[in-house]
Amino acid sequence: MAAKGRGVKTVLVSGGNGFIGRYAVEELLGRGYDVSVLDTRYREPAKGATLVLGDIRDATSVTEAVSHADGVIHLAGVLGTQETIKNPRPAAETNILGGLNVLEACAQYDVPLVNIAVGNYWMNNTYSITKNTVERFVEMFVRFRGSRMTVVRALNAYGPRQTAAAPFGPSKVRKVMPSFICRALTGENIEIYGDGSQIMDMIYVEDVANILVAALEKTDRDGSQGTFEAGTGRRTTVNDIAHLVVAEVARQSGRVVNVVHLPMRPGEDANSIVIGDPVTLGPLGIGELLLPLEAGIAKSVEYFAEYLR
């Protein structure tokens, strides 16, 4: 992306110190971009990136950060399903109002934007509701204000460096892959909410990062691209994921655990089917290059085995 008369390429990544964010930053750096990371507190970004302290809820700091960028990938947000149901306001303020601040700044400076959204946008939990709201605002900005904005609906991203929840890590949000792997590696049974028939689409985090950057480049070249779905299209039940993890942990460590079922958590659907359509990735030319689930689980088990040592 050519900068505004400066001859450099600079991308701002909000939430660039998060799980997907760090991979997106590394992908950008690998392609030769100058990268700034917008974060609320000091955390060392990926090597080669510049940290910009700021909160997306603060329109002034967002506008200032965007004014120095040639492109924006917006990932910052408050996560959680059952964790945010009893107190949705913080997530709504950050995800919706903060997201609007990012959209307004990008529209003001005519900067191409890629906004991350969720595959389960129809679910009645705070995260899905707030992320879908911003996705709708993107559509409004594109249609009525001529903004160069594209949505990437990320399905269930997983991989090394994903933060585990207690007792294995500091995350307040329990994610399926680190939870399953950490429990299995420590000899604890894998816990599944519901009967495990829920269908998910697991996508390796490096593939998500590649899609985000490719979407930004295409938006810069050709304008708004509508919606890309960052998913493999592979229908995998939660039970399938658990048994793949059990098998891989047994292969790498010799430890064998069982799978147990618990009641469903609030905010989740026992019969959910959340699948991406990789055909949407055709314009990016990467739909058939996604890492198979078995290979991604093997890489993830290797990482968490070292993490837990």
For each predicted feature, which ranges?
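Conserved alpha-helical elements of sugar-nucleotide-dependent glycosyltransferases
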Residues: 20-23, 98, 172, 176, ...
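NAD(P)-dependent short-chain dehydrogenase/reductase
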Residues: 126, 132, 136-200, 205-214, ...
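C-terminal substrate-binding subdomain of Rossmann-fold SDR/epimerase-dehydratase oxidoreductases
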Residues: 185-189, 193-309
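Structural element of the ATP-grasp superfamily
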Residues: 102, 138, 180, 280-282
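N-terminal Rossmann-like NAD(P)+-binding domain of SDR-like oxidoreductases, especially those catalyzing
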Residues: 1-160, 299, 303
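Residues in well-ordered alpha-helical elements
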Residues: 60-63, 82, 89, 100, ...
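Generic anion/oxyanion-binding catalytic loop in active/binding sites
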Residues: 51, 73, 80, 88, ...
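Short secondary-structure boundary/capping segments
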Residues: 3, 42-43, 181-182, 219-220
